[in-house]
Each structure stands twice: as C-alpha cells, then as structure tokens.
Amino acid sequence: MKKAKRNPLLARLAGRLELTLDVRSDAAALPPPALIRRACQAALRRDVKQAQISIVIVDAAEGRQLNNDYRGKDYATNVLSFALNEGEPVEGLPLFGDLVLCAPVVEQEAAEQNKALMAHYAHLLVHGMLHLQGFDHEEDAEAEAMEVLETVIVKQLGYPDPYHEEHI
C-alpha cells in the first residue's frame, strides 16, 4: 500500500501556524512558500497559540471583484484580509483567516515604489496578518502604531523599512 503524499502547500510551524496556499494567478514572479511562512510566522503575536491562515494569490479581475464585493471599492487592491473571528484574538481560541494578495497590483506597486518584489510581498503578508489579529489603520494613531510594528517585523525578516521615503 502506498503512503499518501502530504500536500506540499500545507505547512505547520512550531505547532502554532497552519498555512494553505492557493495560487489563482499566472504571474511569473510569486513569493516562494518559505517567504510566505517566514512573514506570516514573524507577524503572529506571541499570545496567539494556534492559527489557520489561507493565502490566496489572485489576478487583477478576481482582486477587483473581491474588493468590490466586500469593501464596495471597484478596483483591485494589494491585500485583503478576512478574519473568521473578527477583532482581537480570544485567548484559547485559534485565529482563522484568509489573506488575498493581488499579484499584478503587488508587482505594479513594487515597481512604482522602487521596492524589491519579494520585500513588498513580505511587507503585505505582515500587514495582512496584523489585520487578521485586530490591528487597523483607520485613525492616524492606529496607522502610526501599525506602521511601526510592520517596520520592525519586516526588518527582522531582513528587508528594508517599507515606509522609508526612498521606497515610496
């Protein structure tokens, strides 16, 4: 009897984080699974004991449709975050959510902002993970706090400050 093969797109990290990856884009340059795992793990708060996150990479049409359906905005955006358990994580309960990255938008932004594409993917994964954990940037103070945290995490991953003026 043959042993069933493990799905290579499913990864467990330190018993805390389970990721699935669904690529629905034909973009040539996509973030490797190792980068996705590292960025998501780095952004996971220490008090989150378990998380199940789906990463979906889409094309512009699907990104636009999702942004329109869920946010009422008729354009494709770089990252959308969908938390199954909205807001602050509840102690003892797993964090569940989906991150949707729109590959053409990420590529365009990286080029326009003079950023390395993989650095931009890492930043957006961190940004999305923070949203799943209740962080927001609706108010100026929230935005500033979130940017500081993103910058610290992205630098820990070995990438430059995503908000530094030479990259914007």
From Swiss-Prot:
The keyword Hydrolase applies. Binds 1 zinc ion. It comes from the Bacteria. GO terms for cellular component: cytoplasm. It is found in: Cytoplasm. Keywords: Cytoplasm, Endonuclease, Hydrolase, Metal-binding, Nuclease, Ribosome biogenesis, rRNA processing, Zinc. Its EC number is 3.1.-.-. It holds the Pfam family YbeY. Zn(2+) binds at H127, H131, H137. The keyword ATP-binding does not apply. InterPro entries: MetalPrtase_cat_dom_sf_prd, YbeY, YbeY_CS. One of its GO terms (molecular function) is metalloendopeptidase activity. One of its GO terms (biological process) is rRNA processing. Belongs to the endoribonuclease YbeY family. This is Endoribonuclease YbeY. The lineage of its organism: Bacteria, Pseudomonadati, Pseudomonadota, Betaproteobacteria, Neisseriales.
